[in-house]
Regions:
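Short, hydrophobic secondary-structure boundary micro-motifs
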Residues: 77-82, 104-105, 140-144, 189-192
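Amphipathic alpha-helical surface "interface" segments used
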Residues: 88, 92, 151, 197-199
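Long hydrophobic alpha-helical segments typical of transmembrane helices together
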Residues: 166-199
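Alpha-helix C-caps/helix-loop-beta hinges
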Residues: 50, 76, 137-138, 153, ...
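GST-like domain detector, emphasizing the conserved glutathione-binding G-site
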Residues: 1-118
């Protein structure tokens, strides 16, 4: 059996899953859903959401569920921090990133008037300020790379790869985190999508 990841290269959630696979060095095959207008995805899963995964014959949908399953079956290099309280905080930050930062991304990408752009940038300013405090004096949220950092990076990285927007330099802790992640993931630039199969 094999693992197939149904994905779109520009999706931040698909990037999150790809980073988890690479961190754990789990081999998998990519099925680009854009190549057949999601027909293979719909045929296998009965829905349109990515990432979805054929996990040795088991249909798994959603980046959070995919990450948890891969971590359970490949426990080396855990994507969660040590301790129940830290794991709970990690999951809360992942959820905040997935549910809140995505809306800020979409608002900025879809801003088609100067007013909409200004409002979207003001929303991001609040998030950047929060993240700047979170990463003060830290390379990662916890003592090493975890799913919280991966989820946050994937949302922020989307600004560079899809929105073509750079994080303002006044948020120095955030830009330092992004540079740290760029080096960790071996990206030539933040404008490059993450594609490596292992780290």
């Amino acid at each position: 059996m094999a693992i197939r990841l149904f994905q779109s290269q520009t999706s931040m959630f698909c990037e999150k899953a790809r980073i988890v696979f690479a961190l754990k060095k789990v081999p998998y095959e990519i099925v680009d859903v854009r190549k057949d207008d999601r027909k293979s995805l719909i045929e296998y899963t009965g829905q349109r959401k990515v990432p979805s995964m054929d996990y040795n014959g088991q249909c798994v949908i959603d980046s959070t569920v995919i990450s948890a399953l891969v971590n359970k079956d490949y426990p080396a290099i855990s994507i969660y921090p040590e301790g129940a309280a830290n794991k709970g905080l990690c999951l809360a930050l992942e959820d905040w990133s997935d549910e809140v930062l995505i809306h800020a991304n979409h608002a900025l990408r879809r801003a088609d008037t100067p007013e909409a752009r200004k409002k979207a940038e003001e929303e991001w300013a609040v998030h950047f300020a929060t993240l700047n405090q979170m990463y003060a004096g830290k390379k990662f949220i916890f003592d090493r790379l975890t799913l919280a950092d991966i989820a946050i990076f994937s949302q922020l990285h989307y600004l560079y790869t899809a929105v073509k927007y750079e994080i303002p330099t006044k948020y120095g802790n955030v830009t330092a985190f992004m540079e740290n992640m760029r080096q960790t993931l071996k990206l030539k630039s933040l404008g490059d999508s993450f594609e490596a199969q292992s780290l």
